[in-house]
Amino acid sequence: MGQNDLVKTLRMNYLFDFYQSLLTNKQRNYLELFYLEDYSLSEIADTFNVSRQAVYDNIRRTGDLVEDYEKKLELYQKFEQRREIYDEMKQHLSNPEQIQRYIQQLEDLE
């Protein structure tokens, strides 16, 4: 698995965490098996007694769907921004003025 594949898988895992409640059971099952459980398309197809192509199409469409949710709702983006701010805050605990600026940045995200 290449670096880009790992980055995509990690992103999809986060998007799945944020948006899984908006998906159908079938969409949830396919994404969970493919990205979280690392099943192959063939294994998923065998599990659900469908074609490999049907699984691929469903995973691709569902991936596009959660990306669209992210584009509109930005839950993952805001999560990443908050995490960066928290990391920076930890580096500046002895500087109250800087901590106050970080708190303001966090409030602005909400």
Swiss-Prot record:
Q: What is this protein called?
A: UPF0122 protein SAV1236
The cross-references to HAMAP family, in alphabetical order and at most eight, read: UPF0122 (MF_00245)
Q: Which purpose does this protein serve, as stated in its record? A: Might take part in the signal recognition particle (SRP) pathway. This is inferred from the conservation of its genetic proximity to ftsY/ffh. May be a regulatory protein.
What is any Pfam family matched here?
Answer: UPF0122
In the record, the note on similarity to other proteins reads: Belongs to the UPF0122 family.
* Entry superkingdom: Bacteria
User: Record's Gene3D superfamilies?
Assistant: Winged helix-like DNA-binding domain superfamily/Winged helix DNA-binding domain
